[in-house]
Amino acid sequence: MRLSDQVSPAGPDPSHDMNLDATSDPMNLDDFIVPFDSPAEHSAHPSVDRNFAATPTGSIPIKSRKDHAMTDSSTAASFPHPPQDQRTNSEFGYVPRRVRKTSVDERQFFAGLSVPTRKRPAEASPQVPPVSNAMMAHSSELSAALPDYSLDHHLLLLLFLAMAQWAPPTSSPSHAFQHSLRLDTYGINEDHGLNSAGPYQQNFHFSPSDSPMTAGNPFSSLYAQTPLASSLNSTEFFSPPPSGYQSTVSTPQPIYEGEQSIFFSDAPSAESHTQRRIPNYIQQRQSNLSASLQPRYMYNMSNGESHPGSAVTGPPTTNMSGFSVPQHVNPSQVLGHGEFSTTAPASSMFTFGGDSDNEDDDGNFGERGGITMPNDFASLDESVDMSAGLHWDGGFPGSVQSLPGFSAQTRKHVTIGSTDMIDGPLEWNQGGTLGRAHGSAASVSEVRNQNQDPRRYGKVPRTASTPNAAALLRQSLNGSASGLPTNHPSPSTLPESGLSSRCLPARQPGGLKNGSTNAGPEPACTNCFTQTTPLWRRNPEGQPLCNACGLFLKLHGVVRPLSLKTDVIKKRNRSSANTLTVGTSRSSKKSSRKNSIQHAPSTSISSRMNTSESPPSINGSSTLGKPGVVPIAAAPPKSGPPAGVAQARAGVQVAPRRQRRLEKAPAGSEPDADDSPKSAAPPSRSKVVPLAPAMAPPAAANPANHSIAGGQGASQEWEWLTMSL
């Protein structure tokens, strides 16, 4: 048995197998998973496995190969063999190998087997040239001359030089700018706010904000300018657009220490004003869609660093503005020396340049985060005429109070057309314009709560546009101790009611000059061109309207047609306040309701004019008794009610708010004694009018009640605005 003699030295002993099984850990299966057999040994002894499988020894064939490999001293077990050859030449090479994940660290176990690592080695990486395959196919010399793809700087420089030689000259406007190599297209190093943050990395050989697919780079001739998903053969559309440069507004920058402050310096000067500039973003925006293909640079250029055929600009050196009319502000003229804090705040390490001015209205201006005031306000003085009929009163030259809104005690005198605005404390969000959209007279709630409600403080939407108001103002001025009106009153002369005691007399329509020297031309209605009206009103643009056109516009929302114009002014019956006839107007009913609670039998016309229609003044001026005075739509007096009214108010139970229909009372509402004629009213009046109780409850003095739409203040406001004649 020569075969058995060959097998016997290498064959395992049954007693040896029993000892091996007794000593091995039955749970440790890692030793039996990976074979250590080499393909060379396996091919040298092809009959070992077959004969050994036929022997009745009961051992496992894998163990026989393991023992056979250990007895052979020609090659070590840790000899590095390619795992592909090991699997293909082995007996079970067709079975995919599955490595079980156990608690044993297999990286150390497979260290001697040369198992491929997770990362691909550098020599096995594909060599990809930075050009398209279509260009490589059409130009064989280009593919042969191109070096291998690398990120080294010298190779990229050679590649760009080679591409610049092969690129054809372009003449289209979209290819107008070709960057030079190593061109600082941003000028970041010259920005004062970024010097201390470290130098900008200038090792880019192409613009970091420019995509290779755009038209302004050396790769412009290698790529199609039309996207694949587009059916338009045009270069006007491209998606996605090139990404913008990273933001420097929100980037935290360390504040200056030891050198000149970038904020307000101790002595305001032009040098300190230009130390910190607001970045001027690009102003010219082209109308076509090719603007999305342009590189988005932040700074405009004014220092002569432009290159021929280049749209890339450097940082500005002059004090340019971001708006259409750049105007410089000298801080020593506009801002006072003691108005604001002049030192930089040292409480924070970084300052952010993108802070909004609307978020810190209460703090000082110098405490905002390092941004100077936008230099778009001219030095406002008396000689500046901003528009034809709009004037700023710059009586405080060289002070901050010439700007619109730094002090609550300044006086702004705005002339719009032929009327004067009333004085009032000013804010940034109030430009002195009318508070209401229709621009008519003030409402009851706005006048009463002018100094009580902080939300309405400073909103005086009244115009002194009628001779009655002007005469009342002149009379109150003559009766006051201050004498002639001045342009800048003391803080004690702020308006306490609907009108101010320091308002200049307005231009008067009609022939009522009353000794005034600034009487202008007679106003005419901008809609129907009439000059005879009992009350002048205004449209939302501030143009004068007659009473009919103004009411029609306010009630219906459309312009009054000229077909409704009549030459005769119809006057309503004002003979008695307690008349309960069918043709009684709503105004007399309103006054009758007011007088019924006061238990007064009748009221004269002059007393009703005193209590409802004549605007009161501060110093107790009386109403003019001239027969030709034109009444205005004004507010009720701000003074308290009489003693009888105060006593009646304490005992009156306030009825809930109700709506009355003039031809029929609503079911479920008990009519009062003074509301009895509403069932006998003419049926033409069918509009539902919300009414308030005759005497307002004590809670009506709360400013919150007047700001609620549909409440008692709103109903009184509606009645006073529309039915004040």
From Swiss-Prot:
GO biological process: negative regulation of transcription by RNA polymerase II; nitrate assimilation; positive regulation of transcription by RNA polymerase II
CDD domains in alphabetical order: ZnF_GATA
Pfam families named in the record: GATA
Zinc finger (GATA-type): 525-549
GO cellular component: nucleus
The keyword Endoplasmic reticulum belongs to this UniProt entry's keyword annotation: no
Sequence ranges of Basic and acidic residues compositional bias: 39-48
Comp. bias regions, Low complexity: 631-656, 678-704
Compartment(s) of residence: Nucleus
Keyword annotations of the record: Activator, DNA-binding, Metal-binding, Nitrate assimilation, Nucleus, Transcription, Transcription regulation, Zinc, Zinc-finger
Chain residue ranges for the region called Disordered: 1-90, 429-464, 479-524, 574-714
Record flagged with keyword Ribonucleoprotein: no
Record-linked Gene3D superfamilies: Erythroid Transcription Factor GATA-1, subunit A
Sequence ranges of Polar residues compositional bias: 442-452, 479-500, 575-584, 597-624
Function: Major nitrogen regulatory protein.
Protein name: Nitrogen regulatory protein areA
Source organism of the structure: Penicillium chrysogenum (Penicillium notatum)
Lineage: Eukaryota, Fungi, Dikarya, Ascomycota, Pezizomycotina
